[in-house]
Curated annotation (Swiss-Prot):
(S)-2,3,4,5-tetrahydrodipicolinate binds at H156, G165, T166. This is 4-hydroxy-tetrahydrodipicolinate reductase. Pathway: Amino-acid biosynthesis; L-lysine biosynthesis via DAP pathway; (S)-tetrahydrodipicolinate from L-aspartate: step 4/4. Coiled coil: none annotated. InterPro entries: DapB_C, DapB_N, DapB_N_CS, DHDPR_bac, NAD(P)-bd_dom_sf. NAD(+) binds at G8, A9, A10, G11, R12, M13, E34, G98, S99, T100, S122, P123, N124, M125. The gene is dapB.
């Protein structure tokens, strides 16, 4: 039985993950963590998730939940995820990160922790989205430079980071498939008189509103035709399901940074 610690256990994603982990054969919830001062501290993680008690009380420090654990599932913030990665590295516990908004410095700190333990770091745990990454890669290779690439994403009004990590990754996948450096190709906003669109540019546009769980569309715009690849999330459950799948796959792997393509076997694993 793989023992799983869930951070942000009282949040929207955390409660979904607790429910999915307890329902997944071979996985069990061994710990639950919330921020210091949260009213969830001391409460049962199973009850908070709307189910039967698990006998697992929510604590305010990840280090308290790590003894005996096999893997941590973390959907918090990139700042908290860095601290959690460092704690997991010190304790020798594998880590699945679904947080977004990572800066290059934060990613570097996670990579440093991954020198000691295996880490799955993915901007989107959905199986469908990770299939879309591969579809975009293939489309970009086939369509080539004759098609302009644009990415549009929309999320609920409460999402704090923009653009989404998934949108950025979609742009990166297209850029890499076209032989372009993402740092040079990706354009995150347009305003004013900019002149003609540079042919090497990949635009990423952000919309926020209502209760939209998440929607991403990649446009390949050519002369006389347009190809669109879209993923629409209608529930957070598919993110939790992917995270549980990653948690079952990760323990026992060599230290390093993995992503959902590795988990799903979409390319040769490490």
């Amino acid at each position: 039985m793989t023992k799983v610690v869930v951070t942000g256990a009282a949040g929207r994603m955390g409660t979904q993950i607790v429910r999915l982990v307890r329902a997944t054969p071979g996985l069990s919830v061994s710990g639950a963590v919330e921020r210091a001062g949260s009213p969830a501290i001391g409460k049962d993680a199973g009850t908070l998730a709307g189910g039967e008690p698990l006998g697992v009380a929510v604590v305010d420090d990840l280090a308290k939940a790590l003894p005996g654990a096999d893997v941590v599932i973390d959907f918090t913030s990139h700042e908290a995820s860095v601290r959690h990665a460092q704690a997991c590295a010190a304790a020798g516990v594998a880590l699945v990160i679904g947080s977004t908004g990572f800066t290059p410095d934060a990613k570097a700190k996670v990579a440093e922790a991954a020198r000691k333990v295996p880490v799955v770091l993915s901007p989107n745990m959905s199986v469908g989205v990770n299939v879309v990454f591969e579809l975009v890669r293939q489309a970009a290779r086939v369509l080539g430079d004759a098609y302009d690439v644009e990415v549009v994403e929309i999320h609920h009004k409460h999402k704090r980071d923009a653009p989404s990590g998934t949108a950025v990754r979609l742009g990166e996948v297209a850029a890499e498939a076209l032989g372009r450096a993402p740092a040079d190709a990706l354009a995150y906003s347009r305003h004013g008189i900019l002149g003609e669109r540079p042919p090497w540019q990949i635009g990423i546009q952000t919309l926020r509103g209502g209760d939209v769980v998440g929607e991403h569309t990649v446009f390949f715009c050519g002369e006389g035709e347009r190809v669109e690849i879209t993923h629409r999330a209608t529930s957070r459950e598919q993110f939790a399901r992917g995270a549980a799948r990653a948690a079952a796959w990760l323990p026992g792997k060599a230290p390093g940074v993995y992503d959902m393509a590795d988990v799903l076997g979409l390319r040769g694993g490490k």
